[in-house]
């Protein structure tokens, strides 16, 4: 807990002064004021994060956090649990959607075993940070102890910090893999937001009506059994969360402590980000939500964060796919701020509009 406390103490708000300087330059550039819309908002936020009018994006990396869930035994997913490890195999071979999109945007992909139920082959190039072989079943008790939840958060933070300080990565993205993980993610928002479970529950991997009703009942039972306190985000994570969700939240905290931008993917990654921002509200200054997931509860999560997603493409895959697509937009925003000339620099008449 001491390590987590030190991490939280290091998180400072982004600079309002540098954000104001960025807006001054953006409004002086050779185009009608605000004509690049939200791209300019992203650019100003990057300046605030980096405390610079030349915020470098540079090397990009996506961490796909993988973990299994005891609640999968309740039949809440259309896929069996062994698919988690099988998909990790696809990631490391470069076969999956995240691999294709990451190559397109020029980002590295690194898979992290936070708690896959099986032992992965030793020759697979994954970061091995296993907290256990899947969480306990949240429908009958807590997913993990508070101590393990803290370890998950610190692991996520350390992964980002190592990639930044030792390898020079400057823009981070998060993604997930874990059969059944929309169930704990839904439980997290229900616990933190106090909204009815049915209004937040989606179809995940494509479950039918019978499985959907079962999923709603399972989440309601998990909340009744664990009684998570919305004012205790660490307790919520331990009670109804997941190992990879903890690491996803920790990644946000780690990026914020380093003052580097991080993009979260969809439903599961945003659940981790929400926990992080409840633990350290200032961490939200460093966070971008990549896209609006088709999972029904995602809008509630984004609203709780007070953010607007960069993209809205009806995606619901996870893996980090939304982060990959959003990275190029974030990079484009930085380039507009840095490279576009002002009216004065270009010798163009400014009408002030």
From Swiss-Prot:
List the molecular function annotations (GO) for this entry. Answer: nicotinate-nucleotide-dimethylbenzimidazole phosphoribosyltransferase activity
Query: Which SUPFAM superfamilies is this protein grouped with?
Result: Nicotinate mononucleotide:5,6-dimethylbenzimidazole phosphoribosyltransferase (CobT) (SSF52733)
Per UniProt, the enzyme's principal EC class comes to: transferase
Q: In which pathway does it act?
A: Nucleoside biosynthesis; alpha-ribazole biosynthesis; alpha-ribazole from 5,6-dimethylbenzimidazole: step 1/2
Show the active-site residues.
Answer: 319
Short name of one Pfam family for this protein? Answer: DBI_PRT
Give the E.C. number(s).
2.4.2.21
Write out the entry's keywords from A to Z: Cobalamin biosynthesis, Glycosyltransferase, Transferase
Q: Which InterPro entries match?
A: Nict_dMeBzImd_PRibTrfase, Nict_dMeBzImd_PRibTrfase_bact, Nict_dMeBzImd_PRibTrfase_N, Nict_dMeBzImd_PRibTrfase_sf
Q: Which Gene Ontology BP annotations are present?
A: cobalamin biosynthetic process
The reaction(s) annotated as catalysed by this protein in its Swiss-Prot or TrEMBL entry are: 5,6-dimethylbenzimidazole + nicotinate beta-D-ribonucleotide = alpha-ribazole 5'-phosphate + nicotinate + H(+)
Mind telling me which PANTHER family this protein's record contains? Answer: NICOTINATE-NUCLEOTIDE--DIMETHYLBENZIMIDAZOLE PHOSPHORIBOSYLTRANSFERASE
Q: What does this protein do?
A: Catalyzes the synthesis of alpha-ribazole-5'-phosphate from nicotinate mononucleotide (NAMN) and 5,6-dimethylbenzimidazole (DMB).
User: Per the similarity annotation, which family is this?
Assistant: Belongs to the CobT family.
Listed NCBIfam families: cobT_DBIPRT, PRK00105.1
Its recorded name reads: Nicotinate-nucleotide--dimethylbenzimidazole phosphoribosyltransferase
* Name of the gene: cobT
């Amino acid at each position: 807990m001491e390590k987590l406390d030190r991490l939280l103490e290091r998180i400072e708000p982004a600079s309002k002064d540098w954000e104001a300087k960025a807006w001054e330059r953006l409004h002086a550039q050779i185009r009608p004021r605000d004509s690049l819309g939200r791209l300019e908002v992203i650019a100003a936020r990057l300046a605030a994060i980096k405390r610079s009018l030349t915020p470098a994006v540079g090397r990009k990396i996506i961490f796909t956090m993988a973990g299994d869930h005891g609640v999968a035994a309740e039949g809440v997913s259309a896929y069996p649990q062994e698919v988690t490890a099988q998909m990790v195999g696809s990631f490391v071979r470069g076969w999956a959607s995240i691999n294709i999109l990451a190559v397109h945007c020029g980002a590295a992909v690194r898979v992290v075993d936070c708690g896959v139920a099986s032992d992965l082959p030793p020759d697979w190039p994954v970061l091995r940070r296993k907290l256990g072989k899947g969480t306990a079943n949240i429908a009958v008790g807590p997913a993990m102890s508070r101590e393990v939840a803290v370890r998950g958060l610190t692991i996520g933070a350390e992964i980002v910090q190592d990639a930044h300080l030792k390898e020079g990565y400057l823009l981070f993205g998060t993604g997930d893999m874990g059969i059944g993980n929309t169930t704990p993610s839904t439980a997290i928002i229900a616990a933190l937001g106090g909204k009815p479970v049915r209004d937040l529950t989606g179809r995940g991997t494509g479950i039918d009506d019978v499985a959907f009703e079962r999923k709603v009942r399972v989440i309601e039972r998990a909340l009744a059994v664990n009684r998570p306190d919305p004012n205790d985000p660490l307790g919520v994570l331990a009670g109804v969360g997941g190992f990879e969700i903890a690491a996803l939240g920790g990644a946000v905290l780690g990026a914020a402590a380093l003052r580097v931008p991080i993009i979260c993917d969809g439903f599961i990654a945003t659940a981790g980000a929400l926990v992080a921002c409840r633990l350290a509200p200032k961490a939200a200054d460093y966070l971008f939500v990549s896209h609006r997931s088709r999972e029904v509860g995602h809008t509630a999560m984004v609203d709780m964060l007070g953010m607007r997603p960069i993209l809205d493409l009806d995606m619901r895959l996870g893996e980090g796919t939304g982060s990959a697509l959003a990275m190029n937009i974030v990079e484009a925003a930085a380039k507009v701020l840095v490279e576009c000339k002002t009216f004065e620099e270009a010798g163009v008449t400014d009408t002030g509009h």
